[in-house]
Amino acid sequence: MGLTVLALIGGYIVVLGVAAWALDAFTGLSGTGVAFMLSLLALAMVLVQWLFSPYIINMVYRTREPLPGEEWIVAEVEQLARRSGLKPPKVVVSEMNMPNAFAYGSPIAGSYVAVTRGLLRLLPKDEVRAVLAHEVGHLKHRDVTVILALSLIPIAAFLIGRTLVWAGILGGGGGERRGNPMALVAVGAALLAAGMVFQLIVSHFNRLREYYADAHSALVTGSPRSLQRALARIHAAYEHNPHLVEEARSNEMASMLFIVAPLTSLTASPLVDVDYLVERLKEQETNPLVELFSTHPPVSKRLRFLDRLASRIGGIEHY
């Protein structure tokens, strides 16, 4: 599982223990162990979901092995994995029309890189390669596992906070030491607020990992421009095909793993030259409030980031 994840889970359990002790000491609620046990149960459920999630994702997204004529995808991923110092992940194709790709995995199921049928239809091979390199970057950085571990903190805060608020509203704890109901509500509300803050931190971390994956793609392919073009085409496809947005909305399980957030609205013509589209999107204004709650950076920022990166690696050639 890795030392990082074990440390995060250990920290999660310590936080739960300290929270239970503090509540018992300062509110007199002898039943705070219930919240602690509920949170441990939530931890167990999340871990089980993580271990078996690849099988669920494969079913929900109707994945299959590449067909004859699609073997080049496997070859590309194997080459990208070797360049990244990784064991090649399993490559599958999702029978979805929305153009996207995602990486996922667990110790039980192994690592996967999935591309949708819509992506293969939309992008030329060099841009598909750039997208695949982005997903391999997520596997290289263990992003799925680390994001999941970080997400346990707001889950714990929300669960304990909600339990305490309702315990206070219903009259406090039981036993010989009856706690102060208002203190329970106050502590619970503080935990709920802390959970919201932690969730924003997790979203920020997820956006940061997207930049790292973009950088990985640019470095291993030597072509930041290919990824820029791919991002622009995917965004334009969502904007001008509402049914793709609806398909993405109905299959949100892996939306945090997508290369592009599928529910973003942009103004772009699918008939315009892709390089012109890239330049237009770089100039898009961003909404800081929307970005705060998003799991992906705005496309304009990603394109400008790749510009800055290209100026540093301009001498790298395509493989």
Curated annotation (Swiss-Prot):
Q: Where does Zn(2+) bind?
A: H134, H138, E210
Give the residues annotated as coiled coil: none
Grouped into one coarse class, the protein's main location is membrane
Give the first-level EC class, as a single word: hydrolase
Task: Identify the InterPro entries for this entry.
Answer: HtpX_protease, Pept_M48_protease_HtpX, Peptidase_M48
Active site positions, chain numbering: E135
Leader sequence range is none
Record keywords: Metal-binding included?
A: yes
| The enzyme's E.C. designation | 3.4.24.-
Q: Name one GO molecular function term.
A: metalloendopeptidase activity
Q: Tell me the cofactors it needs.
A: Zn(2+)
| The keyword Metal-binding is annotated on this UniProt entry | yes
Q: Name one GO biological process term.
A: proteolysis
Record keywords: Cell membrane, Hydrolase, Membrane, Metal-binding, Metalloprotease, Protease, Transmembrane, Transmembrane helix, Zinc
Cellular location(s): Cell membrane
Task: Indicate the transmembrane segments per the record.
Answer: 3-23, 32-52, 146-166, 182-202
Per the entry, the cofactor note is: Binds 1 zinc ion per subunit.
Tell me the HAMAP family matching this sequence: Pept_M48_protease_HtpX (MF_00188)
Record-stated family: Belongs to the peptidase M48B family.
Please state what the protein is called: Protease HtpX homolog
* Source organism of the structure: Aeropyrum pernix (strain ATCC 700893 / DSM 11879 / JCM 9820 / NBRC 100138 / K1)
Q: What taxonomic lineage is listed for the species of origin?
A: Archaea, Thermoproteota, Thermoprotei, Desulfurococcales, Desulfurococcaceae
